[in-house]
Amino acid sequence: MNYSNPTQLQAAILDWAGTVVDFGSFAPTQIFVEAFAEFDVQVSIEEARGPMGMGKWDHIRTLCDVPEIAERYRKVFGRTPTDDDVTAIYERFMPLQIEKIAVHSALIPGALDTLTGLRKEGLKIGSCSGYPKVVMDKVVELAAQNGYVADHVVATDETPNGRPWPAQALANVIALGIDDVAACVKVDDTVPGILEGRRAGMWTVALVCSGNALGLTWEGYRALSAEKLESERKRIHGMFAASRPHYLIDTINELPEVIADINRRLAKGEMPQAV
């Protein structure tokens, strides 16, 4: 048997918050702030956004390793946060997240039509998230009520390692029956999510305006002046640069043009690992 490059995409592996639902990725961010506040430790929205895309326990651990946050914790508890302390914050985070996830469950405007179009072109729709399964079950239920059902879902605690490891993306490849990782595109609004796709050997698309990096509501995004929007795009492109996404677009609504371009490149023999 001989190996031959795939000539077109077979699947899109999509993130959830900030990609398909929850424009601005507010659901997890606000809850991190509230969870730390219950331990009398102040964390700003901007700080909470920093590690977005990681599994939530890892996200909290990363926040606790920020020197300024560790010092605030030490002033309250007399020590810097241990893994047991991280787990205590995580165990408070979880019920808050489940309780309030519905507040930020709306589909990103235009996403459903975009994904319907991709399916008509024969693409399977996989998905993964930094949420654990107990939260994802609720997210999936709410999305279904709004008309979106992915072909497969992988939560962060359903694989040995979460992002930026490639396990969740690869679990989708296996479940969807895809025969080559180069026939997949990973779409995400965070650096860990792009690294996940890169390490899985996939094409990658970073979303600049709908997610964590811009951190605005749909209305706030639409209200930006042309000059401010361009300035923010440049800033966010810089944030993503080290993770080397193949494409950067504002929202998922621009994905069909990217899919068409990837298919052209695959047909010419290009592979994502070589770019």
Curated annotation (Swiss-Prot):
Entry note: cofactor: Binds 1 Mg(2+) ion per subunit.
List of residues binding Mg(2+): 15, 17, 189
Catalytic reactions on record: phosphonoacetaldehyde + H2O = acetaldehyde + phosphate + H(+)
Keyword Metal-binding: yes
Reported cofactor(s): Mg(2+)
A GO CC annotation given for this chain: cytosol
Gene3D superfamilies, alphabetized: HAD superfamily/HAD-like, Putative phosphatase, domain 2
EC number: 3.11.1.1
GO MF annotation, one: phosphonoacetaldehyde hydrolase activity
Gene Ontology annotations of biological process type: DNA repair; organic phosphonate catabolic process
Active site: 15 (nucleophile), 56 (schiff-base intermediate with substrate)
Catalytic EC class: hydrolase
InterPro entries, sorted: HAD-like_hydrolase_sf (IPR050155), HAD-like_sf (IPR036412), HAD-SF_hydro_IA (IPR006439), HAD_sf (IPR023214), PGP-like_dom2 (IPR023198), Phosphonoacetald_hydro (IPR006323)
HAMAP family the UniProt entry points to: PhnX
Function noted in UniProt: Involved in phosphonate degradation.
Family classification: Belongs to the HAD-like hydrolase superfamily. PhnX family.
Name used for this protein in its record: Phosphonoacetaldehyde hydrolase
Organism: Pseudomonas entomophila (strain L48)
